[in-house]
């Protein structure tokens, strides 16, 4: 009998302590802004930004099933998603928007020109009929407390936009595809706390690689993709003491490697006296494998 009482008491105490620890940890996470990349690259792009209770998706260039699996790993589902923000109408960014918009009934946000491009894209089998939501570049709007600004980005799509999202005291800049930086992009970069930015290719790998000439020229053009060097110089030029974390996105499988991108950008920052890991956290996002869940706050992420 005494043994039974002991184990029952021990179990009760353990359950109380476990609940308190879990509740305390969950409350801490609930009060934080979190970011996770589900995929980042020419084979598909999709990012989550929000809290442990709800969030938004930026682009949906992977299957709806894969997106849902990643959400469920975070304890979320489509019911917790307030909408999808689309950067442009290339297939690797919009593969699942038809399914998410018309079957899951998520609002799909973008400019009218981008929505027209989505409608013409044969890769989107389920056409958007009722889920389109339009915004105009340069006009701030709000989604569940997130203040969202958009600006034009140079890329060879129907239209391409970058996003600036202010939420929970943090400013997040998202530029996934960019052939040439512009003044508006640099203005927002100089005030952003957290940056998701393209580092698509190493120029030497591209020029010496197997791509045909026309494709190399397209990538290197002002409406193509941003190189590691351009990305590094852009960050160094606009770094400020409130910039905390930089996530390198849309790395090419054929013309880049995560270590190459990271080392190139770190070297450029170091040349300008900016210490990666101390002054700013920089990490490449993987093409297919989802990233860890990152908490975005006033602290620099420590690997």
Please give the residue ranges for each predicted region.
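Conserved beta-strand hairpin/beta-sheet module of binuclear metal-dependent hydrolase folds
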Residues: 9, 17, 25-74, 159-177, ...
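Active-site neighborhood of phospho(di)ester-bond hydrolases with catalytic His/Asp-centered motifs
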Residues: 58-61, 82-89, 110-112, 173-176, ...
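Active-site metal-binding motif and surrounding structural segment of the metallo-beta-lactamase
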Residues: 65-111
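Active-site environment of divalent metal-dependent phosphoester hydrolases
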Residues: 90-94, 116-117, 158, 181-183, ...
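Metal-dependent catalytic neighborhoods of phosphoester/phosphodiester hydrolases
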Residues: 95-104, 120-121, 256-263
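Metallo-beta-lactamase
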Residues: 112-162, 166-169
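Cap/insert and terminal regions of metallo-dependent hydrolase folds
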Residues: 183-283
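Short, basic/aromatic-enriched C-terminal tail that caps enzymatic domains
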Residues: 281-303
